[in-house]
C-alpha cells in the first residue's frame, strides 16, 4: 500500500467546457501528490425540479447567460485552497467540507456544479492512484451487477420540439442473460423503430437524449409504435422487452390541475389515466407520474399502482435524503431516480442510494438531458448494484459512451458479471 501522503490533494484545476446541448458546463481535474489525477465533467438538466441543488451560471450576454466561469473561479479561489492537503481517499471529509464552506441549503454559494465536479474528480483520482476501476473503488468485491437499461427512444415534453406531453417513452430490454445482449436488443428495436417512422412519414430527427421526436398525437400512439417496433425486431413485448414512461408531470401541472393532451385533469383523474396505460401496455416503470409537490396524489398513486409497477420519484425526491424520507414515511413511491447533480456531491448521492435500499425502494441511476462524455454514472450503477440505468437512446455519443463503458465493465468482470434483468432485479415485476 502506498504511503497515505501519496493520496493528498496537491492541486485542483477547473475549466469551462461544453455539454451535449452546446451549453457551458464545469470540468474539474484533481491532482494528487503521487502524480495520479482524476477528471470529471458535470451534466445539466432541461426539466429541472424546483428542489434541486443550485447550478451557478454567469448571466450576462456571453453564452446567453449560461456561462460557468464564476463556478470555475469558485473552484480555483475557494475550493482548491481548502481541499489541498486533504486525503482524496476521505471522500466524506472532502464533500462535507465543501458543503460547509458553501453554507447554503441548496449549494447556491459555490454552486452545485462546481462542488460536484470536484467531488467526482476526487473519487476518480483516488481510483486511479490505487489502480482500480472506479466501480470497484466506489463499491466492493461484490459490485458485479450490470444494470437493466431504460432506453429513451421516443422523446417528448421538454426534451423535444413535438406535441407529446410525456417526456420519455422507454424500452426496457430485460429478457436476456447479460448486458451486452440487452444492449443489442435495444439497438435492434431502435433501428426497427426508425424504419417504422420512415414508412409512416414521421420525423426521425432525434431529441436531446438521442430518441426520436416524431409529432405524435398521444402517448398511446407512442406506445403502439414501440410495441410494433419490438415485434418487428423479432422480440416479445412484456416477456423480453417491456416499456417505461417518464411523464415529467410537473411540466404540465399548475394550481392542482394537470393540463394533459388538451384536457384538465385532477390528481385522481391523472391516476386513473396512468392506470389505464398500465392495463393496456407492458409498462413496468413510471417516473414522475404526478407533480413534484403533489404529495397527497403520490400516496394515492402508490396505493393504486405501487404493487403493479415501479413508481419512480425524480422531481419528487431530487436525490435528496430529506425528501426521500418524507416519501418513505408517506408511502409516496417505491423507487428513486438518482442524478448526481441534483444533490451535488458523491457522498450525498451514495447516502440517498443507501437510504432507498434499506427502505425497500429501488434506485435508478440516471443521466441528464445535457450530458457529456463523462461515464461516471456507468461505474456508479455497477458499484451500488442499483440494477437499473437511464442513459438515453441508442444514438448521440454522449449517451453511447455510458453504454460502451458498461460493455467494458462486463468484459472486465468476465464470468463474475451478473445482469439484473436475468436475476429479476430491474424494474418491478419484470
Curated annotation (Swiss-Prot):
Q: Which reaction does it catalyse?
A: (2R)-2-phosphoglycerate = phosphoenolpyruvate + H2O
Binding of Mg(2+) occurs at 246, 287, 314
Example of a GO biological process term = glycolytic process
Q: Which PROSITE patterns does the record cross-reference, listed alphabetically?
A: ENOLASE (PS00164)
- EC number of this enzyme: 4.2.1.11
Alphabetical list of InterPro entries matching this protein = Enolase, Enolase-like_C_sf, Enolase-like_N, Enolase_C, Enolase_CS, Enolase_N
Manner of cofactor binding, per the entry note: Binds a second Mg(2+) ion via substrate during catalysis.
- Residues involved in (2R)-2-phosphoglycerate binding: 167, 339, 368-369, 390
What this protein needs as a cofactor is: Mg(2+)
Annotated active site: 209, 339
The membrane spanning regions, by residue number, are none
Protein keywords = Cytoplasm, Glycolysis, Lyase, Magnesium, Metal-binding, Secreted
The pathway entry for this protein reads as: Carbohydrate degradation; glycolysis; pyruvate from D-glyceraldehyde 3-phosphate: step 4/5
Q: Which Pfam families match?
A: Enolase_C, Enolase_N
GO MF terms, alphabetically ordered: magnesium ion binding; phosphopyruvate hydratase activity
Gene Ontology CC annotations of this record: cell surface; extracellular region; phosphopyruvate hydratase complex
Task: Provide the protein's localization.
Answer: Cytoplasm; Secreted; Cell surface
Primary location class: cytoplasm
- What SMART domains does the annotation carry? Enolase_C (SM01192), Enolase_N (SM01193)
**Span of the signal peptide:** none
What is the top EC class of this enzyme, as a single word? Answer: lyase
Please describe what this protein does: Catalyzes the reversible conversion of 2-phosphoglycerate (2-PG) into phosphoenolpyruvate (PEP). It is essential for the degradation of carbohydrates via glycolysis.
- Stated family: Belongs to the enolase family.
Task: Name it.
Answer: Enolase
Please name the source species.
Prochlorococcus marinus (strain MIT 9312)
